[in-house]
Swiss-Prot record:
Heterotrimer of UreA (gamma), UreB (beta) and UreC (alpha) subunits. Three heterotrimers associate to form the active enzyme. The modification N6-carboxylysine is found at residue 218. Its EC number is 3.5.1.5. Substrate binds at residue 220. It comes from Rhizobium rhizogenes (strain K84 / ATCC BAA-868). Pathway: Nitrogen metabolism; urea degradation; CO(2) and NH(3) from urea (urease route): step 1/1. Ni(2+) 1 binds at residues 136, 138, 218, 361. Keywords: Cytoplasm, Hydrolase, Metal-binding, Nickel. This is Urease subunit alpha. It is found in: Cytoplasm. The lineage of its organism: Bacteria, Pseudomonadati, Pseudomonadota, Alphaproteobacteria, Hyphomicrobiales. GO terms for molecular function: nickel cation binding; urease activity. Ni(2+) 2 binds at residues 218, 247, 273. Its cofactor is Ni cation.
Length: 569
């Protein structure tokens, strides 16, 4: 006998279902549930008097015979492939199934078996996303890693060796330092990966860094991003299947943007802070986002364009690049990089899917814990200023949300050769997952999982009688300790370094995994929902930006969501 229940009552008990809408934090972004995998009346939920009990929603099936390790029940998945409600089963640290959980002996349509060994995470009324990936990290201090984890980032790729002046400005790690850094990674609950320096005109030193464990190479103007260095670096990358990230020549000393495009020779490359405030050919590096072989990304200090963006950038730049305010040439260098016209255009290029990735540039002009926040602030600003996207098919913002979440999950993973392991909620991938209360979406996660184990969560007083009394703050959980730490996260390296015996030589506890498919197999077209290649023109005097002839301009925001309302200090 069926029982009717109101939508409001159903959502309160089991979370939103097909056709229901959810607001993301305090933004103007609204998502609509596209599909619900449940069977109405057969939902599973944990708790006193609830369904997941012996002989009811819990079966007698052992783990060995198919029961999963963990089920996240009734979660609203937000990913590039869909916005759907489902149970998610985790096993052996990976996503085992997305569908309907329960007891196949008593319930129909079960695709995820709950057994006595199964742990439950209540996803009712929560949003589930893939862990974020930050592909532009300056490893200036190890404390960044905890900050990033608590913001919902589960994979960090970058370079450096601490607060050395080379690392303060660039993400280029030398061969000996790569090995020392990989050894240190056993201490951190985070998937980690290193870039070697790409600035050399002969290949031997670059090959040395790849064999030491670099999974990518970084060309940075502070080390001399000349056409010869660009060509040499890309040639080594093609041979070893590692990605190249580029920060081009702001001063145009060794050539202009056209010369850099010529030196790249149509090969795949990941262009950092492609707008230019973070560095690159002044004033028109932004042109390269129209190249089919260039994967363009932003760093978060220019995300989004606000009334404060220009003012804060000059001082940041002077500190990060070891410049002196008493030297006129240094000031001129800094000022040449900061242009309100190109920053405004960057907002729009993200919204139309011409810029593909957002990362932090941690402590080197960027904020490591604000990748998600700045991404969604940009999306909100663009909706308010530009309205609905043409691709939207319903009374919702589903397409825009899919476009923007791709920028810090699957797209950086594809660009850097990690997407076979991380970047999306798909069966077979690592269970690096983030659970959000919709009111705090993108700002403060409710739980962060690494390899299927809980690594971080807000937690109250450990001496309290329940978990919620103040002081409530983020704390590392069990996956952040002991052997669970090294079994729950991994280090990404080059295949060549594994073939050369890196794991045995270093003796690290974390598993070393190889990146793959970073070269000719990918391009701008591989960037999900963010593959547009418009023809870009920049006026050399006014810095106005046009895409396919259309002027790209917008006003700076005076107020942002996901800001002071969420942060007391």
């Amino acid at each position: 006998m069926s029982y009717k229940i109101s939508r409001a009552a159903y959502a309160n008990m089991f979370g939103p279902t097909t056709g229901d809408k959810v607001r993301l934090a305090d933004t103007e972004l609204f998502i609509e549930v596209e599909k619900d995998f449940t069977t109405y009346g057969e939902e599973v939920k944990f708790g006193g008097g609830k369904v997941i009990r012996d002989g009811m929603g819990q079966s007698q099936v052992t783990r060995a015979n198919g029961a999963v390790d963990t089920v996240i029940t009734n979660a609203l998945i937000v990913d590039t492939w869909g916005i759907v409600k489902a149970d998610v089963g985790l096993k052996n640290g990976r996503i085992a199934a997305i569908g309907k959980a329960g007891n196949p002996d008593t319930q129909p349509g079960i695709t995820i078996i709950i057994g006595p060994s199964t742990e439950i995470i209540a996803g009712e009324g929560k949003i589930l996303t893939a862990g974020g990936m930050d592909a532009h990290i300056h490893f200036i201090c190890p404390q960044q890693i905890e900050e990033a984890l608590m913001s919902g980032v589960t994979t960090m790729l970058g370079g450096g060796s601490g607060p050395a002046h080379g690392t303060l400005a660039t993400t280029c790690t030398g061969a000996w330092h790569i090995e020392r850094m990989i050894e240190s990674f056993d201490a951190f609950p985070m998937n980690l990966a290193l870039a070697g320096k790409g600035n050399a005109s002969l290949p031997a030193a670059l090959e040395e860094m790849v064999l030491a464990g670099a999974c990518s190479l970084k060309l940075h103007e502070d080390w001399g991003t000349t056409p010869a260095a660009i060509d040499c670096c890309l040639s080594v990358a093609d041979e070893y299947d590692v990605q190249v990230m580029i920060h081009t020549d702001t001063l145009n000393e060794s050539g202009f943007v056209e010369d850099t495009i010529g030196a790249i020779k149509g090969r795949t490359i990941h262009a950092f802070h492609t707008e230019g405030a973070g560095g690159g050919h002044a004033p028109d590096i932004i042109k390269i986002c129209g190249q089919s072989n260039v994967i363009p990304s932003s760093t978060n200090p220019t995300r989004p364009y606000t009334v404060n963006t220009i003012a804060e950038h000059l001082d940041m730049l002077m500190v990060c690049h070891h410049l002196s305010p008493s030297i006129p040439e240094d000031i001129a260098f800094a000022e040449s990089r900061i242009r309100k016209e190109t920053i405004a255009a960057e907002d729009i290029l993200h919204d139309i899917g011409a810029f593909s990735i957002i990362s932090s540039d941690s402590q080197a002009m960027g904020r490591v814990g604000e990748v998600a926040i700045r991404t969604w602030q940009t999306a909100d600003k663009m909706k308010r200023q530009r309205g609905r996207l043409a691709q939207e098919t319903g009374d919702n913002d589903n397409f825009r949300v899919k476009r923007y979440i791709a920028k810090y999950t699957i797209n950086p993973a594809i660009a850097q050769g990690l997407s076979h392991e991380v970047g999306s909620i798909e069966v077979g991938k690592r269970a690096d997952l983030v659970i959000w209360n919709p009111a705090f979406f993108g700002v403060k996660p409710e739980m962060v999982l690494l390899g299927g184990s809980i690594a971080a969560a807000p937690m109250g007083d450990p001496n309290a009688s329940i978990p919620t009394p103040q002081p409530m703050h983020y704390r590392p959980m069990f996956a952040a300790y002991g052997k669970s730490l090294t079994n729950s996260s991994v280090t990404f390296v080059s295949q060549a370094s594994l073939d050369a015996g890196l794991a045995g030589r270093l003796g690290v506890a974390k598993k070393l995994l190889a990146v793959k498919n970073t070269r000719g197999g990918i391009s701008k077209a591989s960037m999900i929902h963010n593959s547009l290649t418009p023809h870009i023109e920049v006026d050399p005097e006014t810095y106005e930006v046009r895409a396919d002839g259309e002027l790209l301009t917008c006003e700076p925001a005076t107020v942002l969501p996901m800001a002071q309302r969420y942060f007391l200090f």
